[in-house]
Amino acid sequence: MAIASMIRRAGIAAGLAFAATTTVLAQTAPSLLDTIQSRGALQICTTGDYKPFTLAMDGSFEGIDIELAKSLAKALGVEAKFVQTKWADLLTDMGSGKCDVAMGGISVTLDRQKKVFFSSPYLVNGKAPIVRCADKAKFQTVADIDKPETRVIVNPGGTNERFVRANFKQAKIEVYPDNVTIFDQILAGKADIMVAESIEVKVQEKAKPGLCAVNPDEPLQYGEMGYMLPRGDATFKAFVDQWLHLAKATGEFAKIYDQFVR
């Protein structure tokens, strides 16, 4: 009995020692947080084609997430360096270490979450159609849109394309490479409809007379946006989440948002 008790106690002690060692290793494991500060720069991947979040303008970028990226870099005490990417390359660029964070209206999805971390969501969004105003009454639901005569246009490689292919089985789908001029194709009568994030279609409705967002406050699909982070780096994610929390609590986030949306 005494021997059995000693074995049990030894097992418990070994387990506690292993847990303590694991905790220490987790606490001392190198983090991108340290690398960024040593480097003196935060490398931010962004597509530059998604107004009002990120838009490439004459060699620089502007938008909600561009200003927030600068805020994050300032909180880290480093310079913000932007790296242009494409929607189809986001996960590859994050996995290769090309960037420390990806920002620019990126939807949080379970498929993406399998490969990367995301910050806490910073915006609730969802997919909504945008059409010529004369056609607004025709395209109220997925069923209204999914007809053989409907021409749906979509940018490649992101959640817009995934939504379109998952939900429209009869409509004609055209993949158009330029997410900046894609809305002009609808105005020109070369396509009937595009489905994008509700905030984007609201902005485009204001920017392009003749286009109307369809029920943007009642989107076809619920969605959230977050900042894409390297998988496994809990220390860096904790810093980004706390920075985001403070940006919202202090009103900095709202001020930047209103600058581009209101």
Q: Model segments located where?
A:
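Bacterial N-terminal signal peptides that target proteins for export
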Residues: 1-14
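Short helix-initiation/N-cap motifs at beta->coil->alpha
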Residues: 66, 82-92, 139, 174-188, ...
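Ligand-binding cleft/hinge of the Venus flytrap
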Residues: 54-56, 69-78, 141-142, 146, ...
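Periplasmic-binding protein-like
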Residues: 124-131, 198, 202-245, 262
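Flexible hinge/capping segments at coil-to-helix
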Residues: 133-151
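Extracytoplasmic small-molecule ligand-binding "clamshell" domains
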Residues: 27-105, 114
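A ligand-binding cleft/hinge motif common to bilobed small-molecule-binding domains
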Residues: 89, 105-114, 163-166, 183, ...
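Ligand-binding clefts/hinges and TM-proximal coupling segments of bilobed small-molecule sensing domains
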Residues: 27-31, 159-173, 213-216, 244-262
